[in-house]
Every structure is written in C-alpha cells, then in structure tokens.
Amino acid sequence: IGLGIPAEPLFRSFRFKLTHDEVLAAEQKEVLAKAGYDISRLDNGRKLVLITGHRRENFGDGFINMCTAIRDLKDKYADVDFVYPMHLNPNVRKPIHEVFGEDLKGLGNMFFIEPLQYLEFVYLMSKSTIVLTDSGGIQEEAPGLGKPVLVMRDTTERPEALASGTVHLVGTDYHKIMDEVSKLLDDKAAYDKMSKAVNPYGDGKACRRIVDFFKNK
C-alpha cells in the first residue's frame, strides 16, 4: 500500500489465502475422519501423541514392547489421545493385534487408523504434542513444527538432531518409552527444552532468504 499499490487487490488476495488455507484444513480433517480420527477432539486443549512404526529391525519382540508401552500409556493418560496410522506390513499389524486384540475400535483414547497421505500426516503432526516413531524422515520434519520426537530405535542416522536435543532415543525398551513419554506429558520444562531446541535442519526461512538474495542482485 505504501508503494501506491491499490489496497483492494491485496486484501482480495489475502482473503483468498485465508479461504484457501481453511479449505485445505477442512479437506484434511475430512480425510482424517474417514481414516478413523476426529481432529476436533483436540479443540479443548486435549493432547495428542502421534505414533508411527515400520522398521524391520523392530519386528517381533521390539514391536510387542512398543505396543505394550503404548497400551499402558493410553491407560495412564486418559486425557491424552494416542493416534497410530498403521503401516500395511503384516509384521507391523500382527503385534498390534496381539497386544490390543482383534477389534481395534472402541479403545477409548487409542486410535488405530489407516495410513495417511503426506499432507494429511503433516497436518496431524502439526496438531500433535509428541511424536513417537522409528522413522528417519520424521526426525527431520517434526522439529520444524516444534514437536519433540522420541525415536524407538537404538541408533539414528540423524546425529545432528540428537546433538541438538530435538530427538531422544528410547529404543524398544518398555520402561524407556514409558518414562520418556510420561516426562514430556508431565514436565513442562522438559517439554519446552525439546520443543524449543534449535532445529539443526533450518529455521524455516530459507525461501525468504532466497527471494531476498535475488531481489538484491
């Protein structure tokens, strides 16, 4: 406006941006609802632990330990939702059924849902409190959203994330998973330390810096 550009087109563009974002959010909410989770459950400040698991090295006892810890955490924290988009691999689904039973519906605050497309998953991750995962990529993505990541592996190929404090290793040890998730849910200082740690993968301003670079050329 200060440059003499008429205000109306700018405001029209701004309104379009808001409307576009609202439409995308509505679409993602609808996809999540069809997959088995109603995101509006979080409207009153309810917390969410997002879970993923698929690593081959965790098949067998590792997944049993993970699922047992998740089951006990969901019982311990009735005011927290636990959402697990299940990988299609039978080696992942079998231990889930062994621990939670054949019927995965009606488990209170535990929601096993079908796999999500990337945008819906990122949307769900943005609404989460903690991410509990054995994924490599999520260790890079979640810190950009300010989400602490507990990695259910004994090692990580993202040592920079470990060093910066955005991720912690818990392995598939029942007690470590229980203790670390409980600490982040109960201890605000511990949560803030992880969620506000410096993201080793950038501050989200790369696009702005690139634009500024070319503008100043």
Language model features with spans:
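Single conserved hydrophobic/aromatic residue that forms the stacking wall/gate
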Residues: 1-9
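Amphipathic alpha-helical segments at domain termini/boundaries
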Residues: 8, 18, 53, 180, ...
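Donor-nucleotide binding loops and adjacent catalytic segments primarily
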Residues: 19-127
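Leloir-type glycosyltransferase catalytic cores
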Residues: 23-29, 168-217
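Hydrophobic/aromatic beta-strand patches that form the interior of the parallel beta-sheet core
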Residues: 83, 111-113, 130-132, 150, ...
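Short, acidic/turn-prone active-site loops that include or flank metal/cofactor-
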Residues: 115-117, 154-157, 173-174
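A donor-sugar binding/catalytic signature common to diverse glycosyltransferases
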Residues: 122-162
